[in-house]
Design a protein with these regions (language model features):
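N-terminal flexible segment immediately upstream of the FAD-binding catalytic core
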Residues: 1-72, 88-117, 260-270, 308-331, ...
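Conserved glycine-rich FAD pyrophosphate-binding loop
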Residues: 2-4, 79, 84-86, 93-100, ...
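Short amphipathic alpha-helices in soluble, non-transmembrane regions
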Residues: 12-16, 74, 241-247, 288-301, ...
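Buried hydrophobic positions in well-ordered alpha/beta secondary-structure cores of metabolic enzymes
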Residues: 16, 63, 74, 87, ...
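General beta-strand structural signal in soluble alpha/beta enzymes
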Residues: 25-29, 59-61, 81-85, 103-105, ...
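Short cationic amphipathic helices and targeting signals
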Residues: 56-61, 119, 226-231, 274-288, ...
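FAD-binding subdomain of flavoenzyme oxidoreductases
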Residues: 110-112, 123, 127-128, 132-256, ...
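A conserved active-site cap/scaffold subdomain adjacent to cofactor or substrate pockets
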Residues: 249-306
Length: 474
C-alpha cells in the first residue's frame, strides 16, 4: 500500500508526498516496522511497554529546507513528530508514543566546517564520518558513542551521554558539544542557536526540545591507538588498575572493566580469556604502551593483544556489553549507575559490597571516565542475571545500592526525568514551551511519568539481537 492510498484515512499524507515525493514517505507496515524498534528491549519493562508502538508514516527529508518544510507542515496540522537517527537508543527515545510521523534524519547529512578544536555537521551525519573528517586535519572527536559507525550527530547528543573518549575528556556535558542550532516546531519555524552552557538544555533530551539542524563538537589532537585485553584474577585489582590508568598521564580513550562471567559472554574474544577471569578493555595511545603495560602488571594484570580478526574493541563496552549479556542470558536485565567519584577507596568498597550481596546477579561492568577537573568517575552499566521477580527484585536492588551511596540512573523508563541523567528540567521545560508550543515533539517523553503507569512485564521470545552496526544497512 502506498502513502497516497493510505492518505484516504490521513489526508495530510498527500501533502508530505507532494513535498518530498512518494519514495520519501513510507506508510506501509512492512516498510515502517524497522523504524519502530530500537534497543529498549534491553529492559524487559520497556520491551513490554513499547511492544505496540505504531505510527502513521515515516518521512525522510534530504536537506535542511525539506526538514524545515516537514516541521512546518506537521505544526500546521498538529501532527505528533518523533525525530529518529539510527535508532541505537536504549530507552525508547525514538519510538513514538502517539500516532503521527517519524522523521528519519539520516538523509540530512554532511560536514559543514572543520577548524582547530571544533567541527560542525548536519544532524543526520554519521559519527564515523565526523571522526574521519576530523582525522583528516590531525584531530579527533573528544567523545563519540561506541555505536559511532552508525549513530548520527543529533541522535548522539539527544539520546546519548558519553562513550569513547570519555576516559580522557569526559561526557557530553563536559564542554564537548560546543554549539547547536535548532528550529522551532511552528507553522513558520524559527532558528535558535545555543552555545556554551545553554547547549546542556538539549543534551540527552530525547529530541523533545526543538529539531536540531546543526551540531558543533569539540576536537582534540589525534592519537594513534592500540586495543588490548588486560586479564585479571581479582576484580578489585582490575578496578584499581582502571582507576589509576585514567588518573595517570597515559592517554586512554577507553577503560572498560568487565567482571566475570561477562567476558565469557563476549563470544568473539572468549578464547583469549581464561575461565573465571575479569577483563579491562583498553584503547590507549600507542606511545604510552610501555607505561600502560607496566601499570597493568603492577596490579597483577596480563596484557594481551586484541585477537586478530575479532570484532573491534569498541563493540564490547558501554551498552554493547548489555547486548552480549542478553544474547547469553535472554531473560537478563540491566541498570546504569555511578559509583563514588574522586574517592578510589570508597569506590572499591562499593564494588566489594555489591559483589558480596549479589554474586552472579549484579555483574559489574564499569566504564572509568573523567570530568573537566580530572576527577575520576566510575559509570556502571551492569547486566542483571537471574532476578526471580524482575520488578520487585529490581526495586530492592536499587534500594540497596542507593544505601551504599551508588547513584542509580534508571534505564527502565522512556521519560527524560526518570532516567536520572539531566537532573532539574525546569529550564528545559521552559525552552520546550518556546520551541514546541503545540506540544507535538516526541510527546510523552518530557514532563511525564512512566513509573506510575507501568504494567506487569511480559517477556518476548521474538527479539532481533543483532548489533546496531548490523542493522544499519536495512
Amino acid at each position: 500500500m502506498t502513502a497516497v492510498s493510505e492518505s484516504q484515512n490521513r489526508p495530510y499524507l498527500d501533502e508530505f508526498v507532494a513535498l518530498l515525493g512518494d519514495l520519501q514517505v513510507l506508510s506501509e507496515g512492512r516498510k515502517i516496522s524497522r523504524y519502530l524498534r530500537d534497543f529498549s528491549w534491553y529492559s524487559p519493562i520497556l520491551e513490554n511497554a513499547l511492544a505496540d508502538t505504531s505510527v502513521d508514516a515515516v518521512v525522510r527529508p534530504r536537506n535542511i529546507d525539506e526538514l524545515t518544510a516537514v516541521v512546518a507542515l506537521a505544526a500546521r496540522h498538529r501532527i505528533p513528530i518523533t525525530m529518529r537517527g539510527a535508532g541505537t537508543g536504549n530507552y525508547g527515545q525514538s519510538l513514538p508514543l502517539e500516532q503521527g510521523i517519524v522523521v528519519d534524519i539520516k538523509g540530512v547529512a554532511g560536514i559543514l566546517d572543520v577548524a582547530e578544536g571544533r567541527i560542525a555537521a548536519l544532524p543526520g551525519t554519521i559519527m564515523k564520518s565526523i571522526e574521519e573528517a576530523a582525522r583528516g586535519t590531525g584531530q579527533e572527536l573528544a567523545v563519540m558513542p561506541s555505536t559511532y559507525r552508525v549513530a548520527t550527530a543529533s541522535g548522539f547528543i539527544s539520546g546519548g551521554s558519553g562513550g569513547l573518549g570519555a576516559a580522557a575528556h569526559g561526557d557530553l556535558w563536559s564542554n564537548n558539544v560546543l554549539a547547536v542550532e535548532l528550529i522551532t516546531v511552528e507553522e513558520l519555524p524559527r532558528t535558535i542557536r545555543l552555545e556554551g552552557a545553554d547547549v546542556n538544555l538539549i543534551l540527552h533530551m530525547y529530541g523533545t526540545v526543538g529539531v536540531i539542524t546543526r551540531v558543533e563538537m569539540r576536537l582534540v589532537p589525534a592519537h594513534t591507538y592500540e586495543d588490548v585485553l588486560v586479564v585479571f584474577d581479582d576484580f578489585e585489582q582490575c578496578c584499581r588498575f582502571g582507576w589509576e590508568l585514567v588518573d595517570s598521564d597515559i592517554h586512554a580513550r577507553l577503560a572498560s572493566l568487565q567482571q566475570a562471567p561477562i567476558p565469557a559472554m563476549m563470544t568473539p574474544i572468549t578464547h583469549e580469556i581464561p575461565e573465571g577471569s575479569h577483563v579491562a578493555l583498553v584503547w590507549s595511545d600507542l606511545d604510552d604502551a610501555a607505561s600502560m603495560r607496566a601499570l597493568a602488571e603492577s596490579y597483577g594484570g596480563t596484557v594481551k593483544a586484541w585477537p586478530e580478526g575479532a570484532t573491534h574493541i569498541t563493540q564490547f563496552p558501554y551498552s554493547h556489553t548489555i547486548l552480549w549479556s542478553r544474547k547469553a542470558e535472554p531473560e537478563s536485565s540491566w541498570l546504569q549507575c555511578e559509583y563514588a567519584s574522586g574517592d578510589k577507596d570508597r569506590f572499591i568498597e562499593q564494588v566489594r559490597a555489591v559483589t558480596e550481596r549479589y554474586p552472579g546477579v549484579f555483574l559489574q561492568h564499569i566504564e572509568i571516565n573523567t570530568s573537566p577537573d580530572r576527577t575520576v568517575r566510575c559509570m556502571g552499566i551492569p547486566p542483571l542475571v537471574g532476578l526471580a521477580n524482575h520488578e520487585e527484585a529490581l526495586d530492592e536492588l536499587i534500594s540497596y545500592c542507593t544505601g551504599l551511596g551508588i547513584y542509580l540512573l534508571n534505564p527502565h523508563s522512556y521519560v527524560v526525568e526518570e532516567g536520572g541523567f539531566v537532573g532539574d528540567t525546569e529550564r528545559m521545560l521552559a525552552l520546550k514551551q518556546e520551541v514546541d508550543p503545540f506540544g507535538i515533539l516526541n510527546p510523552g517523553k518530557l514532563g511525564e511519568s512512566f513509573f506510575s503507569d507501568r504494567t506487569a512485564v511480559v517477556v518476548s521470545s521474538e527479539r532481533d539481537m543483532r548489533a546496531p552496526e548490523q542493522l544499519s544497512g536495512e
